[in-house]
């Protein structure tokens, strides 16, 4: 049945995020940002391993080298080798000693650039940015005056980019030309804050809704197709996975929840796998020529 949860993993993530499917190894990867851990799940047996990281790992993409990730740590962009722990810094964007702002949500674009937005963690003036890291190493800023950058996704033909500044509760879309020109795509309900997102093979946008305990699927025209309930208060990110890319995998978070809320629902902070009637797209690989 579409939307049925077939499996869940409960590592009690403080802030599960950045979930990515690696079709080459048939593994699912995600991060617990605040827990400073990278998780990897083998699809064939659901076995999960975890790797500690030296600073908060906020988002990552796959590269043409299966042993390396293109990573957005809290302070900047780097190549990261999970097996060895090696980090090769490319750009430092923030200072770990001034934690009011850090990198946050990120996705590989169809244009082979690694797009990442940042977040203001102390609720001061919106001063976060949207970055794109090119294969030649160039880092460009495409938007500023952001509070919490989230919801990055790309149409299958690579013509459009989706984005949300979460507190505004509005998903936006722009044609992927320079300069980007943003237009309203969808507005969420009062209790639903759009977080991480993914786009399926048909061009539908799937948005994890923090605070609403669900994932909402939108057609390319912004109308709602369906909503899948998630047994966690704060779904945070999603992606399609599995050999046929027909399973929607959703991370969640415990951060900000009370001890009572967690005791009443121990699945808070879990990663959920749902069977769907939709199919995702393989991840774009960051080119190896710069590795």
Protein language model annotation of sequence segments:
Residues 170, 186-223:
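Loop/turn-rich, solvent-exposed surfaces of beta-rich toroidal or solenoidal domains
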């Amino acid at each position: 049945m579409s939307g049925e949860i077939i499996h869940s993993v409960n590592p009690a993530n403080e802030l599960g995020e950045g979930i990515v499917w690696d079709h080459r190894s048939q593994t699912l990867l995600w991060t617990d940002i605040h827990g400073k851990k990278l998780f990897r799940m083998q699809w064939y047996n659901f076995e999960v391993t975890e790797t500690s990281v030296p600073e908060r790992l906020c988002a990552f993409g796959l590269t043409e080298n299966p042993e390396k990730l293109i990573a957005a740590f809290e302070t900047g962009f780097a190549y990261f080798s999970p097996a060895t722990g090696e980090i090769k810094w490319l750009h430092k964007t923030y200072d770990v000693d001034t934690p009011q702002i850090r990198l946050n949500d990120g996705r590989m674009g169809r244009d082979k650039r690694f797009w990442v937005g940042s977040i203001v963690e102390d609720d001061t003036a919106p001063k976060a940015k949207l970055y794109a890291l090119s294969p030649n190493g160039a880092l460009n800023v495409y938007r500023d005056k952001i509070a919490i950058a989230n919801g990055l996704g790309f149409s299958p033909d690579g013509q459009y980019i989706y984005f949300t500044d979460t507190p505004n509760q509005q998903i936006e879309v722009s044609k992927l030309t320079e300069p980007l020109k943003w237009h309203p795509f969808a507005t969420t309900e009062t209790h639903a804050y759009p977080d991480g997102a993914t786009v399926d093979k048909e061009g539908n946008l799937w948005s994890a809704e923090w605070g609403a305990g669900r994932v909402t699927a939108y057609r390319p025209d912004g109308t709602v197709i369906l909503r899948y309930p998630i047994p966690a208060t704060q779904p945070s990110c999603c992606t399609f996975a599995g050999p046929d890319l027909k399973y929607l995998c959703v991370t969640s978070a415990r951060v900000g929840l009370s001890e009572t809320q967690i005791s009443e629902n121990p699945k808070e902070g879990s990663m959920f796998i749902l069977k769907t009637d939709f199919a995702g797209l393989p991840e774009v690989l960051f080119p190896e020529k710069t590795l």
